[in-house]
Amino acid sequence: MSTTVEKIKAIEDEMARTQKNKATSFHLGQLKAKLAKLRRELLTSASSGSGGGAGIGFDVARTGVASVGFVGFPSVGKSTLLSKLTGTESEAAEYEFTTLVTVPGVIRYKGAKIQMLDLPGIIDGAKDGRGRGKQVIAVARTCNLLFIILDVNKPLHHKQIIEKELEGVGIRLNKTPPDILIKKKEKGGISITNTVPLTHLGNDEIRAVMSEYRINSAEIAFRCDATVDDLIDVLEASSRRYMPAIYVLNKIDSLSIEELELLYRIPNAVPISSGQDWNLDELLQVMWDRLNLVRIYTKPKGQIPDFTDPVVLRSDRCSVKDFCNQIHKSLVDDFRNALVYGSSVKHQPQYVGLSHILEDEDVVTILKK
């Protein structure tokens, strides 16, 4: 583990010393690719157990339809926020390193059961295996949404450190995968096409990165103005995690109105005061929007719909088959068709099959054989 960390440090030092220009672009491309491979090595050893794994007390049994991880430095108010939202008591105090294990809680919001995980305070250097940060990050990667909780008295400083740590282990916040297609070939060399001008990336850098990954023949199609980091992300796709995140700017009760107005300009941010219960409703609504959950109401044949207890599905898994499996797996075996009311169908109601994609607040009657 220490050898990998030392190699990473050596490459970072060399990159810092190297001035970027046309003559050095090939060399810098190779260094960036080497760095990405070493970071993957570090992450793999941390998650497999040779470097500590998730660790006792870090990972917890999952429950609910989605999970939200609380990430932040010690004593920014994570434990207080968890307690206010879920009623779960996590030890909270005004000194650092209070929470030493992952503390789970559950909130029921708009009929959905959502698990919230108060992770131990992430610290600078976590991406290099220092402290307990790598175990915290291993759990954070498995969440559906991250609350990056910041103290408003020093938001930008801590925000930049946390983003750097998460970037270093392959977590991409509020981003989508780069639109780059790579098709490997047996021969013919590297051919590069682009549908938009590439203002951040030259052919030398592209060939250097591909060479480092031992890919000598491939067709590469750029459909976005990519950087060398974007190209590496596509090559390292299996170790990348694209996650929505909300920057929770806590302790706003210490600010003036003018200062508060400035905070609202930060993208993907929600200012709150967990201690004073300020703006928690807005935080939950933004959380709901970012989780992209779908509520489906059941309507037994010949009865009125049950609007009190929806079946909640993820937006990427919301077919009629997913709905049936959520209720009971035997429903799929006995399924004849479904009668759906709502925005997912043209006619009200309409008969559909198992592959039909449901939308939020549809009403469904399952008809058996």
Curated annotation (Swiss-Prot):
Main location: cytoplasm
Keyword GTP-binding applies: yes
Boundaries of every OBG-type G domain copy: 66-292
TGS domain segment(s): 292-368
BP GO terms, sorted: cytoplasmic translation; positive regulation of cellular response to amino acid starvation
Sorted UniProt keywords: Acetylation, Cytoplasm, GTP-binding, Nucleotide-binding
MF terms (GO), sorted A to Z: GTP binding; GTPase activity
Record's GO cellular component terms: cytoplasm; cytoplasmic stress granule; peroxisome
Domain of life: Eukaryota
Regions annotated as coiled coil: none
Modified residues (N-acetylserine): S2
Pfam family name, one: MMR_HSR1_Xtn
Role of this protein: Involved in ribosomal function.
NCBIfam families (UniProt xref): small_GTP
Protein name: Ribosome-interacting GTPase 1
Organism of derivation: Saccharomyces cerevisiae (strain ATCC 204508 / S288c) (Baker's yeast)
UniProt lineage: Eukaryota, Fungi, Dikarya, Ascomycota, Saccharomycotina
Recorded name of the encoding gene: RBG1
